[in-house]
């Protein structure tokens, strides 16, 4: 595996940054790279890829097309991914050819829920009670230990509420197991919480680091609908949360950015939910609410440029545009304080993120 770069990568014709994945996050990563003076090369399968419109070059290929991946890696000085569920063999191949930020260990930990929880617990986070489920016998036994029911989640390849089902004592466990593909799962207890929050830590390959202000989030059906930031958290809790997040990042060997999603329970305690080693929907407000957005900071961490804590320039609200969004735009267009971001996706589907709105609220 190629070591993480220590020398600064400055903009020039030979220093091309690689981006894996052609969606809205890849697009916004590329736009920040361009703003900073870098050229970008995108790798993604053919499809509805809005990032293709803003990069300098792109390669269409599947995630197991190793010849094309090698060609891509030979053309970039380092690479990052817009999503965590990139195949392990793909990451291993790329890591032997170029510098991948964050590293493959970070991505693997984010892909497997059980590993994610184990490393969170090792870092000092409290997690929901959970059980690894390998078969229906495990599921039956573990479900009896969940007094208030639980959430059965596939151990890998789940995001935005996909690959998970709530269960209770009346559930048909055999049917649910089959519907999830009869694959390894985790069963988590259902928590009563006051709110959902997220924190983002970042570390440059020059070893400087920092945090963004904390976000408060509202989800519906597993999909983020609205974020308000900065979230108000008492100083002791915020300091403790930063320490644990930094410890988690150290245990992962992180360079790049890391979002950590959490629950604040009714008693004020904070419980780990999951990580995302990439730009995160709950920090899209930073595009307007900070001097450096999460995408700008990712570029700096990739290129070994110094970073530090980022402060907000007020209180911001981010609203996702999901599925058919025209009515929302019709209403919000009456208020010039809304800043509209459309991702340029051609096909509208229920539950698909099509854009977002940012607005300063104080």
Feature map (PLM): residue ranges:
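Peripheral (often C-terminal) accessory segments that flank ATP-dependent C-N-forming ligase machineries
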Residues: 1-5, 13, 300-362
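ATP-binding N-terminal substructure of ATP-dependent carboxylate-amine bond-forming enzymes
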Residues: 1-111, 137
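Short, flexible turn/loop "capping" segments at secondary-structure junctions
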Residues: 51-52, 155-157, 348-352
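Active-site nucleotide/adenylate-binding loops and adjacent lid/helix of ATP-dependent enzymes
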Residues: 109-198, 202-248, 362
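Phosphate-binding core of ATP-grasp and ATP-grasp-like enzymes
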Residues: 180-233, 239-272, 276-284, 299-309, ...
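A conserved FAD-binding loop/helix module that cradles the flavin
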Residues: 286-288
